[in-house]
Amino acid sequence: MDDDYIIDVKGLTKLYGDKRAIDGLDMKVRRGEMYAFLGPNGAGKTTTVRALSTLTGFDEGSVMIDGYDIVKNPMEAKAAIGVIQQHISLDKDLTVWENMMSHALYQQMPKADRKKRIDQLSEYIGLGDYYNYKVDNLSGGWKKRVAIVCALVHNPKLLFLDEPTVGLDIQARRGLWDLLRKLNNDGMTIFLTTHYIEEAESLCNRVSFIEKGKIIAEGTPEDLAHKIGRFTVEYYGLDRNTKYAYFESRQEADDFSKQFDDTYTVTVRRTNLEDAFVEMTGNRIGDNGFMLKKPEKKEGA
């Protein structure tokens, strides 16, 4: 394995009966990256995270985490991994401190190190004033922060987050984004799944579009957008049926936009990650994570 990569996956396949939840997936994630799987509910995001983080088995392929085969060397691989699942597994009847300490015990941390590590992480994340709060009394955003401390208590190199901001309001979501940026800037490799295009575009160095257990496209948000054209003309007439055209240059986009009369509303803008996702997959994702009705075929140059 190339030591530059903390995740190296080849031919990963997971079957549920005749259904391929993961379908021959190949991927690599570099150390220190913030990497996103972007796709709708049912695309295979959660199943992939569970397989990569040793929470479920798989039928074909290989997974290397931090240089260790997760089948042949599961304990070594697990030591490098922290996981936060979409549905947080905290004990709501315990305090913040009790939850964090129970995770330290689960990770078999030496007694002398537990309090020091929890205090360090809590100060870093801003949880020090909440030790005596019952978890059930915290907001969704603060519960996520407790879960992050629990996931990092054994000092892993890689953090998996499955749909980390689902159910959070916009303020809590952006607060969590800031925290993830801070962790990443300090060297943590982060692999997250999301159906929020803005989240992937704002946070991540590289993004994969995933659909039916396969990676459709992969690259930086900018590179993915540029694959369909650097500039987008968005236009609609009296029927309010929005269409799109993509161009490599602003001049081409401007020239195209001049053909429309005053009955049309026309916008020329830079192409974004959402444009690329819709163009490459033929679908849009709703706020609830489910596919919306396929848009009408776009027109373009």
Regions found by a protein language model. Name each.
Residues 101, 105, 112-130:
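Conserved ABC ATPase "signature" region
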Residues 134-138:
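Conserved ABC ATPase signature
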Residues 155:
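Conserved catalytic motifs of ABC-family nucleotide-binding domains
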Residues 159-162:
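Catalytic Walker B motif of ABC-type/P-loop ATPase nucleotide-binding domains
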Residues 175-254, 260-261:
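ABC transporter nucleotide-binding domain
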